[in-house]
Regions:
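P-loop NTPase motor domains
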Residues: 1-183
Length: 183
């Protein structure tokens, strides 16, 4: 199956019905894929972190979402950039330590951001002979040594970015292995 040609955010559901009718009219109803957290039977599962894109690209998407929501500019830029950085390195750490074919999850990122024990558990699993783990270890060393007020500010931004994905029904719809890859 080809990847979708576009993604439409339709929280109210009224636009989706119009698109469905249009697809049916042109014989393309089978090409329409839907992410509907409230109706898992008709929905695909899509984990935005289940992607071959690098960690920087994935984290940058979250920053772009915050900017589109009007959270950019001025003093927020520092916090958004810092949040993207911790998300990027969290994705990297999860990719190094998750079982094969298990993509990172928002819940695991939140756990790393909020718990030194979770970081220690994951970093203890790293293969230190792999030179790719060094930036990840270095970042989390800085994270643990960071001034508590600064770390708390970053944690707040990350929590605000991830929170919707941690609650049902979104936690199920946007986790695990994706039904199809969108990106």
């Amino acid at each position: 199956r080809e990847p979708p040609g576009g993604v439409i955010l339709d929280p109210k559901g009224d636009y989706g019905q119009k698109i469905r009718l249009l697809c049916e009219k042109y014989g393309r109803a089978s090409d329409l894929v839907v992410i509907d957290p409230f109706d898992q039977r008709r929905s695909i599962r899509w984990n935005p972190l289940d992607s071959d894109d690098d960690e920087l690209e994935l984290a940058s998407r979250f920053g772009a979402v915050l900017e589109s929501l009007g959270m950019s500019g001025g003093e927020n830029t520092f916090w958004i950039d810092a949040a993207q950085r911790v998300i990027r390195h969290s994705i990297s750490l999860l990719r190094f330590t998750n079982p094969a074919n298990e993509p990172p999850s928002f819940r695991d990122i939140q756990s790393l951001v909020s718990s030194f024990a979770a970081i220690a558990d994951r970093t203890d699993q790293l293969d230190l002979s792999n030179p790719g783990v060094e930036p990840c270890l270095s970042f989390f060393g800085e994270w643990m040594d960071m001034a508590p007020n600064q770390r708390s500010g970053i944690q707040t931004h990350v929590t605000n970015m991830l929170d919707p994905f941690l609650m049902e029904p979104y936690a199920t719809a946007f986790s695990g292995t994706s039904t199809i890859r969108i990106s």
